[in-house]
Design a protein with these regions (language model features):
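A contiguous pocket-lining binding segment that forms or flanks enzyme active sites
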Residues: 164-184
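Gram-negative (and chloroplast) outer-membrane scaffold detector with strong preference
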Residues: 83-161, 183-185, 189, 226-240
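Intrinsically disordered, low-complexity serine/threonine-rich segments
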Residues: 14, 19-20, 56, 60, ...
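Predominantly the C-terminal beta-signal and adjacent terminal strand-loop region
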Residues: 103, 177, 182-240
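Hydrophobic alpha-helical segments of small multi-pass membrane proteins
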Residues: 129, 147-149, 172-179, 197
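Flexible, solvent-exposed loop segments that connect beta-strands
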Residues: 60-75, 99-124, 151-171, 203-224
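Bacterial Sec-dependent N-terminal signal peptides
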Residues: 1-25
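Short glycine/proline- and aromatic-enriched beta-strand/turn motifs that initiate or cap beta-hairpins
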Residues: 21-94, 230-240
Length: 240
């Protein structure tokens, strides 16, 4: 009888031991399955891969330093607009940016007889390829950034009553850096806020007046820093 009790006890312990092992194995398998699931926002197969964008806002040129042969610039603030596209391969990608700054001021010109009002309009056009990156914060929020190097074109136009129109241009290489935040409204549209910088220096102006060009060639010996900061709001339209 005693041996039977001992055998029964051993059998019961064996059953409980096997049951405990099965439970432990099940828990371990469940843990592995949970850990193998991609974290929310990192499953790139579920993320869009490309969009076109457009935005507008304000630009600010902090440098108004005087350069030998050229008066200090009065173009401090103006309208900034930007359009382009971005194509991603998981986190990183590439894109193209077209951005322009426009500022207008009215100045008085005195020819020795009378004072005349003139409109002085300055434009800075920038076109560049970009290297881009993005960081998914959730289902709707994404932080992104871009850095590029491209072509910078400056154009200044002066218009005055009785004076006609006079334009000057200068070309240079420049760089850009952008950081932005996007809020997804749907699978197709997102709203964005961008902060950034476009940097470069312009050289000697080319004007459409022979006499004035000769004077510029003689007196203009430096470069002007046209680096600007900007803030824009816009939209992303997902097409891929």
């Amino acid at each position: 009888m005693k041996k039977q009790v001992i055998l029964l006890a051993i059998s019961i312990l064996g059953v409980f031991s096997l049951h405990a092992q099965e439970i432990n194995k099940s828990l371990t398998q469940s843990k592995k399955e949970v850990n193998s699931q991609p974290r929310k926002g990192t499953d790139w197969n579920k993320q869009p891969i490309g969009y076109v964008f457009a935005g507008a806002g304000i630009g600010y040129i902090p440098s108004v330093e005087k350069v030998e042969g050229l008066a200090a610039s009065n173009y401090v603030t103006g309208l900034d607009w930007r359009v382009g596209m971005s194509r991603y391969y998981n986190r990183w990608g590439w894109g193209v940016l077209v951005q322009q700054f426009r500022s207008k001021q009215s100045v008085a010109f005195y020819d020795g007889v009378r004072a005349m009002a003139m409109d002085d309009i300055g434009r800075l056009l920038y076109i560049a390829p970009q290297f881009t990156g993005r960081w998914i914060l959730g289902e709707k929020l994404t932080i992104y950034g871009a850095i590029g190097w491209g072509w910078l074109r400056y154009k200044e136009t002066v218009k005055g009553s009785g004076l006609g129109e006079l334009s000057g241009t200068a070309n240079a290489l420049g760089g850009n850096f952008t950081v932005g935040l996007e809020y997804r409204l749907s699978s197709v549209v997102g709203m964005s806020v961008d902060l950034g910088l476009i940097g470069g220096e312009i050289g000697k102006l080319k004007v459409d007046n022979t006499g004035l060009q000769a004077a510029i060639d003689e007196t203009y010996t430096g470069k002007m820093d046209v680096t600007r900061l900007y803030a824009t709001v816009g939209a992303h339209i997902y097409i891929w």
